Amino acid sequence: MADGGLIGLYPGTFDPITNGHLDIIGRAAQLCSKLVIGVARNAGKGPLFPTAERVEMVRAEIAPIAERTGTEIDVQAFDSLLIAFAQQVSAQVIVRGLRAVSDFDYEFQMAGMNARLDQRIETIFLMASERHQFISSRFVKEIAQLGGDISSFVPKLTLERTLRRVGRP
């Protein structure tokens, strides 16, 4: 452990950030003295929001968590290899959320590859809370684009921005 406590990195595209992401961030913040939220540029996924706007939304939505937990939470965009970004921000752990068994298979492989690239950085998995196990940014975008109600899946600011982005009032 580094001087001052554990530094964690929670990476994702956050396109958009969901209540499930916020749940994982809140729980990770209780484990770490500093938590970096890495917003992946990931143009290959065809993001709904540009990177800068995703960073801005994440910053706005996590502010109450940082205040409540007293944890330093930093939000940064990145477009490098995840392990290289983890090294850059001095993370000792990469935090990943798991919703279902299907998530585990992919995440297990990624954790193994990351360990091969830098065995000093651990991956820790946090299980999604029961009420958030089915939420994904992909489903949120699809439901919003098709006129469905996403208000129980995303926080208020993100709800407003997502509805505007898909052309809904």
Swiss-Prot record:
What does the record note on quaternary structure?
Homohexamer.
GO MF terms listed in the record are: ATP binding; pantetheine-phosphate adenylyltransferase activity
Which protein is depicted? Phosphopantetheine adenylyltransferase
Where does this protein hold substrate? T13, K45, L82, R96
Q: Which organism is it from?
A: Acidiphilium cryptum (strain JF-5)
Reactions the enzyme catalyzes: (R)-4'-phosphopantetheine + ATP + H(+) = 3'-dephospho-CoA + diphosphate
GO process terms (BP): coenzyme A biosynthetic process
Keywords annotated in UniProt: ATP-binding, Coenzyme A biosynthesis, Cytoplasm, Magnesium, Nucleotide-binding, Nucleotidyltransferase, Transferase
